[in-house]
Amino acid sequence: RDKDIVRCLRCFTCMAERAATSTRRCTVNPLIGRELEGDEIQPAPVKKKVLVAGGGPGGLYAAWTAARRGHQVILCEKEEELGGILKSEIAIPFKKEMYQLTETYARFARQSGVEIRLGCEVTPEYVEKEAPDALIIAVGSRPLVPPIPGIKGENVIIVNELYKNQDRVADKVAVMGGGLAGCECAIHLGMEGKEVHLIEMRDELAVDANVRHRPLLLKEIEKYVHVHAGCRVEEVTADGVRCRDKDGNELMVGAQTVICALGQRGRTDVVEA
């Protein structure tokens, strides 16, 4: 039974929504705050063939929901592993619930009869071949990697790929990007005893964190991370990151490893194809 429990992510969405909108919401339980609206899942009047493109949390949940409604569901994931962006959370111990959510949704989908095809990319030709009655596109996003000189150097790791490259992270690290992902990555590396420098071009950090989570996050940043706010990255070198602050002064942040956490961009090109 333990494996059938959708566990709390400790994401603070429930408390943040209460403060912001006077409602209750939950990242993993869509019934929270909607208890009077009736059952979430209703049997479909007609069974259809549904093709889901993408094996991240969104695709898995959509496939599971469609299967519970009685549809024939095929889920395709182009990688050899399910999880989407949540695969990267396995690198950070205090984010393990995020990674476990993928495992839970995958188990539910399989138990509901969803056919999962790994290493299978959905293309227009593939859709034509399968001829589904409905196509759900849940291909997620890709890391935003601006054309900064040196950003493709051997000492640079994209934050989404950290879980596969932890042995490459040296003792002195610069994290580019002070959003939620960059901040959490920096805290984790700081907890491991590394010297971590966080570079953010805005004056504030983690502006994408919710109102309850952010204050706690900033306290951990103070404990473990050297912050360089208001600094724009101009170049990545073998010695670290060259930046410029808002007054025009040049700053060199020394680092052996550079983590790129400059955001995500929706894969709209896949949708439009």
Predicted regions and their residues:
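Repeat-solenoid scaffold signature
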Residues: 1, 108-119, 125
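Flavin-dependent oxidoreductase catalytic cores
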Residues: 1-52, 57, 62-68, 169
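Rossmann-like dinucleotide/flavin-binding elements
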Residues: 44-77, 82, 117-131, 138-155, ...
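Rossmann-like dinucleotide-binding cores of NAD(P)H-dependent redox enzymes
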Residues: 72-112, 188-231
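Short, hydrophobic/aromatic-rich segments at coil-to-beta transitions
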Residues: 238-241
